[in-house]
């Protein structure tokens, strides 16, 4: 498939989770609130705001967070969309200054994809026994020359799994600086070649 990187994803921008309806511009969210809370009384305001905080299209529309200045360096004036409150911690300037940032990790992933045809053309196979695993997604990509093992932890927990091939495998990329083989840390992503 074709990978997509949405604006802000390359620096780890998050959903804004604005607390008040007035913080949103998305008419779909605003209209849904009024319809379900005010008109039909199907939901209370607090429950609906939790839903909007997660699902509003405004989450994908907040201004790009360029730096930690007012309005995140996006504008000299109040932008139409509110700036995500975490812009001082998550912004382009900070990402470019950190060699271990998400930005540089994405660059390494893109470089790996361009340099290894197995990633785009290799055969996919779920690692046997991984079908029922609710914490780890592990699969291989294989062509005539190369086999890759991809291990992804989708949880905030440290998980232990044993993969026989790791003894002879070379770690190509990880979002942690060190490799603990069978220990897969929270949200860890590792790619091995063997």
Could you say what each language-model-derived stretch is?
Residues 68, 173-176, 188:
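Residues at the C-termini of beta-strands that transition into short coil/loop
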Residues 143, 165-166, 185:
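Flexible, charged surface loops at secondary-structure boundaries
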Residues 158-176:
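Beta-strand-rich binding/interaction modules
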Residues 179-194:
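C-terminal beta-strand-rich structural cap/linker in extracellular carbohydrate-active enzymes
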């Amino acid at each position: 498939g074709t990978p997509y990187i949405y604006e802000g994803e390359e620096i780890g921008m998050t959903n804004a989770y604005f607390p008040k309806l007035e913080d949103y511009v998305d008419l779909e969210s605003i209209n849904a609130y009024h319809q379900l809370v005010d008109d039909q009384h199907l939901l209370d305001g607090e429950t609906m705001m939790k839903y909007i905080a997660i699902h509003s299209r405004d989450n994908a529309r907040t201004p790009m967070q360029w730096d930690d200045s007012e309005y995140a360096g996006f504008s000299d004036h109040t932008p139409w969309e509110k700036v995500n409150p975490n812009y001082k911690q998550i912004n382009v300037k900070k990402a470019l200054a950190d060699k271990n940032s998400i930005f540089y990790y994405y660059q390494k992933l893109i470089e790996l994809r361009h340099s290894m045809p197995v990633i785009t053309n290799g055969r996919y196979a779920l690692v046997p026994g991984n079908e029922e695993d609710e914490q780890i997604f592990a699969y291989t990509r294989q062509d005539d020359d190369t086999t890759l093992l991809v291990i992804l932890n989708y949880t905030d927990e440290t998980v232990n799994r044993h993969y026989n091939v790791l003894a002879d495998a070379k770690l190509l990329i990880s979002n942690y600086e060190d490799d603990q083989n069978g220990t897969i840390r929270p949200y860890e992503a590792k790619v091995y070649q063997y």
